[in-house]
């Protein structure tokens, strides 16, 4: 039994609050247990230099953790003058995954910037950021179409992400911080709406893990992603 009392295939309680930020084209506050991430999507009429004149858009992401989001205060990276390696890795992960589910040609010469700010961290911040960012992106596209800035919907698919791990010899879904810090294996799965994989990250923390253990984690992750897709659809249809 997990310390939280959850079953091995059980997600933490999840909520998606739509449009908490009034100035962004789209925003979502995602809460997965005690992990809370504010996700927003903002449109700019500029693109990176390598895309100028190609009538093609771009989606990029920025990620950060508020100083009080963990048990010990995190120093602001802006105050230190540079981003840490973890921050760069996660925001690149979010950006490239978001680009997989949008037709950049249909976006035109525009850039959508996804901002993910971790308010409270209790494991799974990057997967929560991806799941919440899709909702923010969807709302931003809806806003741009309503304003007739976009004539066609460039979104190709839903996207959601979830963590899995091997904890005390058992495959479990959606690790919290205590589980993550003591897991034998830590992995993240990113899925498209049709169930196909977009990205997989997996690391053995103590000993190599078997193919059977990987398949067990994959099955749990796929089931968890299906629940996340259902919740995304429910809140977006009701908006």
From Swiss-Prot:
UniProt-annotated binding residues for phosphate: 86, 124-126
Keyword Nucleotidyltransferase: yes
Catalytic reactions on record: tRNA(n+1) + phosphate = tRNA(n) + a ribonucleoside 5'-diphosphate
Keyword tRNA-binding in annotation: yes
Keyword annotations: Nucleotidyltransferase, RNA-binding, rRNA processing, Transferase, tRNA processing, tRNA-binding
Pfam family, any one: RNase_PH
EC nos: 2.7.7.56
Organism domain of life: Bacteria
Any GO BP: rRNA processing
Example of a GO MF term: tRNA nucleotidyltransferase activity
PROSITE patterns, per the entry: RIBONUCLEASE_PH (PS01277)
Stored CDD domains: RNase_PH_bact (cd11362)
Subunit structure: Homohexameric ring arranged as a trimer of dimers.
Physiological role: Phosphorolytic 3'-5' exoribonuclease that plays an important role in tRNA 3'-end maturation. Removes nucleotide residues following the 3'-CCA terminus of tRNAs; can also add nucleotides to the ends of RNA molecules by using nucleoside diphosphates as substrates, but this may not be physiologically important. Probably plays a role in initiation of 16S rRNA degradation (leading to ribosome degradation) during starvation.
Family: Belongs to the RNase PH family.
Protein name in UniProt: Ribonuclease PH
Gene: rph
């Amino acid at each position: 039994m997990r310390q939280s009392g959850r079953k091995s295939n059980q997600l933490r309680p999840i909520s998606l609050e739509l449009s908490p930020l009034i100035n962004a084209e789209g925003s979502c506050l995602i809460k997965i247990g005690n992990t809370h991430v504010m996700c927003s999507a903002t449109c700019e009429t500029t693109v990176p230099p390598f895309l100028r004149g190609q009538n093609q858009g771009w989606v990029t992401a920025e990620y950060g953790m508020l100083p009080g989001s963990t048990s010990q205060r995190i120093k602001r990276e802006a105050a230190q003058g540079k981003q840490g390696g973890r921050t760069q890795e996660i925001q690149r992960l979010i950006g490239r995954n978001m680009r997989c589910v949008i037709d950049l040609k249909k976006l035109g010469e525009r850039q959508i910037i996804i901002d993910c700010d971790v308010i409270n961290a209790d494991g799974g911040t990057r997967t929560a950021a991806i799941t919440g960012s899709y909702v923010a992106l969807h709302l931003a596209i809806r806003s741009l179409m309503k304003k007739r800035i976009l004539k066609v919907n460039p979104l190709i698919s839903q996207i959601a992400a979830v963590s899995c791990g091997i904890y005390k010899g058992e495959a479990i879904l959606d690790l919290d911080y205590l589980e993550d810090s003591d897991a034998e294996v830590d992995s993240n799965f990113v899925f498209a709406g049709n169930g196909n994989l977009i990205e997989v990250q997996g690391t053995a923390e103590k000993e190599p893990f078997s193919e059977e253990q990987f398949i067990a984690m994959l099955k749990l992750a796929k089931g968890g992603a299906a629940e996340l897709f259902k919740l995304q659809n429910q809140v977006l249809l009701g908006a």
